[in-house]
Amino acid sequence: WLMFQMGGIGPMMGQANVFFRYFPEKIQPVIDRYQNESRRLFEVLDKQLSTNEWIAGEYSIADIANWCWVRTHNWSGVSMDGLENLDNWKNKMYEQPGMLKGIKVPVDRESILKNDEDKKEFIKNAQKMVKK
């Protein structure tokens, strides 16, 4: 399940982010491709979580690695509608020791993204990286 994140969710969500939020041109077929594939992978996780409390059976690095991407689904434009198992797991992950502290390293992006001016600055800086 860690490899599922490394070879599936990580790359697909990363590209969904780039093309949905940061790429200078909006290329809808590309955006759709990455968002739809991310959604399909979310459905795989949702099915796995229908019979397991944690992705690999017991709480593990697989949960942490996958959660880092699942929790950003809105930012990437990926719907979690109808994925109750995945949504419950995502919310339960916030309660795990160290998770709230960890997502604030190196900066508290969730706070930044709540402020429109800070959000614009964050996107502008990310777009600079995409253009390189």
Features from the language model and the residues they span:
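Active-site cradle of extracellular carbohydrate-active enzymes
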Residues: 2
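Acidic/histidine-enriched, glycine/proline-rich intrinsically disordered or flexible terminal extensions
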Residues: 106-132
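GST-like fold's C-terminal all-alpha helical module
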Residues: 5-98, 102
